Amino acid sequence: MAANKDEFSVKQIFPKLGGERGARNPRYGPTSSHDLVEQMEFLYVQVIQAINNSVVNPSARICCPVVEITLGNYKSSTKNLPMGPNMDWNQVFAFDKSKGDVLSVTLKDGPTNTVINKRNFKLASEIPTRVPPDARIAPQWYSMHNTETDFYMELLMSVWFGTQVDEVYPEAWFSDACEVCASRVINTRPKVYLAPRLCYVRVTIVSGHDLISKDKNKTPSVYVTATLGKVALKTKVSSGTNPSWNQDLIFVASEPLEGTVYIRLIDREDEQHEGCIGTLKKKLTEMTPLKVPSSAPALFYDIEMPTEVKPAGDSRRFASRLKMKLATDQAYHVAEECTQYSSDNRAFVKGLWPGLLGKLEIGILGATGLKGSDEKKQTIDSYVVAKYGNKWARTRTVVNSVSPKWNEQYSWDVYEKCTVLTLGIYDNRQILEDKNKANDVPIGKVRIPLNRVQSDWIYTCSYPILKLGSSGLKKMGELQLAVRFVYVAQGYARYSAPFRWMLPKAHYKSPLSMYQIDKLRAQAVEINCANLARTEPALRSEVVSDMLKPKSRNFSIRISKDNFDRLYTVVKMVLWCVSVIASVRSTTACTPKFIALGVSFVFLFWEYYIYWLVTSWLVAYCIVLCIVVILLREILKSPRQTYNWLFYRNVTPPPLILVDLKLRKLDSINLDELAEEFDSFPSSENDLNILRMRYDRLRKIMENVMLLMGDAATQGERLLAAFTLLERPFVLIILLALCYCSMLVVCLGWDLHVRKCLIFVFICYWVQLPWFRNNLPDGSLNFFRRLPSNEDLMF
């Protein structure tokens, strides 16, 4: 199955950013908070309050007003909105101004559905336009009288044309969501979330003192459990009245660090029975805050026993003690993402943060051709979540559209450029009343590494949303983005940033193991899910966990081939250099051999002439000539871009390449390899023929790996065997004699000219001139091949 390269490639687009007034280079043109998106014009209608002045008709005085707003085929109403005690709603409705010519505002009596009055506004002449930072349009009272039914009411409202820059945009009820239940409209609104920063809590259980078992005739076998929130960790079992553990139990907590750690000592009476012999609780605020890489002091803590214990003949209070180190490790960065997709490396304490490096701005323009997981559903209620650092941004939900337009812009502070921005697009399942318990469905993700983004350029591209499954590579649509990174730091701070530590110093002074990092990352994800689920509107847990989902570690033949090709590409240049040098030695032609000897002779004996040539003006002229040739070549290669850069400072950057199908072995896909990659563990495949075929394929691959590992082990064992020969006295004596002879030769050849002659003679021998040439193996190589290895001992 071959993938279409053009279909899955990043395409360059040319939107009208900033309403055709945005500059491509922020240094040379006007910018605004929305210069990376296309301007969207809306008709805003703010319905604030109604007043009932009816005095003639008694039934009119108990009116329950409802406002209906109509533009073309779109209709919105306050019917399902909660009404205040003074008949106020204070709700903003937003319509696409191109959907009609006349805006109709109708006031009705809700219980009887009686029309009280109607107001019509012509869009072409009667509605003003507001562009921030202009002041808000003042609301007006409109008389809504009906002489036939004796309704005398007034409606306070305001109507204006605006864009997505307007302050009411995040709280507006859009016309495409008019069918959404009023209680669910909040789930369609855009929002920015700041996740609380995370910190490690280190509980080091050192030892116990004077521990007493419930059974006085038994030596206690105790382990310690510590619980913070929903996470419980325990130590190993240690026996004795003064057991020792010296074991770290590390938790993850979020600011403002108000939790409590509960510690229990469990005595293992036998394999089936356990009993608690002591408890202790400590608040996080009582622990030692470590803001530099260090260790907390070890202190003794009295344990609260389940039953009071008093030794015989002693009236003093008796208490077992536990020696511990309790600290909040604020000098670490808590990883919530995998290393490849990390977007933040800062420590918990703000004093350890590096200087601000730059600003990242993202314009989420829209999407095209979206496909949901449910093929029966023709439309999608989609929204985008962008995550960088602890700041999450969520666009509004565009209802019933496979090609939504958002045109929302967000920005982030960047402290490290070697990070990744993650954007996920989801199908909103929370906007219908009957889908209260349904989860939002992920459509796909796009990741943009910042180290591939050049500063001061605006990348406007359409990124494919790819989903890889057992059936192959599937395109779920395209996400249109405008990306810009601008440096804020200047001078030394900017150019020294690539050389500073990627992680806080504590990660290098007291590093955590990969096993610990994976376990703590799982804790961090759960805490983030819980924290963001408590916001309003909530960023749901399934969305947060999907955005923080790490790379799969399942076995994949496709990825194995990919990693081999990557490794081969890295060492290809080294292998090429080695092959060129080896070809000089192995060839029968004399020309390359004499060239090598000539170059060696010049560098060994004519160094004065080389020094004169380097310090002369001739070399400087040659370097300047090379620079001119390089610049002319670039100018002639793309004259239009050079002209734009020189006169307009406006160069369209090339599209960012985020996925290399050939490198990832996705240009030609083996469906069985994909089925094996996405198979569960243990395997859920029931077809024995398929399992046998996969097993035979793996055996063939591992056969080559086995032989390669065996050859490498054999050569290494022969090298070790050469050192074991030194244990023999005769060999040691010969080695000392050879060392003495070598030192004698070095001393005799210490003169510069003699040393150069010795080096030149060695080069002459190494290149194997015709009179030195010998196709038979060298004596040292013959000796090395005769050294023993453990391969002979294997059965």
From Swiss-Prot:
PROSITE patterns: C2. Its cofactor is Ca(2+). It comes from the Eukaryota. One of its GO terms (molecular function) is metal ion binding. The keyword Ligase does not apply. The keyword Lipid metabolism does not apply. It is a multi-pass membrane protein. Expressed in root vascular tissues and meristems. Observed in flowers. Ca(2+) 1 binds at residues 57, 109. The chain crosses the membrane at residues 590-610, 612-632, 730-750, 752-772. Its main location: endoplasmic reticulum. Keywords: Calcium, Endoplasmic reticulum, Membrane, Metal-binding, Repeat, Transmembrane, Transmembrane helix. May function as a signaling molecule by regulating the trafficking of other regulators. This is Multiple C2 domain and transmembrane region protein 12. It comes from Arabidopsis thaliana. The gene is MCTP12.
